[in-house]
Structure formats: C-alpha cells, structure tokens
C-alpha cells in the first residue's frame, strides 16, 4: 500500500488534467474489478461484487485532481508569485 501511495503522489493531476492519475487507478483496479467505466466527465467508476447481498453496500469516493500552481512572475527579490488552478 505504501508503494501505491508513493506512486500516486508522484503523478501530476491538476484539475482538468487528471488523465495520468485516472490511467494509473484504472490499471490498478481492472485486475480485481468486475467492471470499470469512465463517464463523460472523466470520473472513474469501479464495480466489485461482494460475496453476499447487503442492503447498503459500501461506497468509496475520492478526488483524482489536486490543486495546481502556476508560476506567474518573479519579484525583484527573486520570490515567485503563483496563481492556483483547480
């Protein structure tokens, strides 16, 4: 699990540009999932059937994107000024 977390942290995924994260998650999920779907907005939906029927099956939701930073300029003292994306 630690190696998976490290791999995810190394991926770039600012809002609107999450494809690297999505493809990594798809590759990790497909071997153990019953069905994997990407919807029109890029959400990755993974289905895994349980061994028994339960009234309220568990659901795991998470963001794939991260806040991105754009360096806009450097001031006279060499400090960078950033804008956020996402």
Each PLM stretch: what is its role?
Residues 1-86:
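N-terminal hydrophobic/helix-forming segments and targeting peptides
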């Amino acid at each position: 699990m630690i190696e998976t977390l490290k791999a995810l942290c190394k991926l770039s995924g600012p809002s609107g540009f999450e494809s690297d994260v999505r493809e990594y998650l798809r590759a990790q999920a497909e071997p153990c999932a019953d069905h994997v779907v990407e919807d029109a907005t890029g959400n990755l939906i993974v289905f895994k059937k349980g061994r028994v029927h339960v009234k309220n099956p568990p659901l795991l939701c998470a963001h794939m994107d991260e806040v991105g930073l754009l360096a806009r300029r450097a001031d006279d003292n060499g400090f960078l000024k950033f804008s956020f994306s996402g």
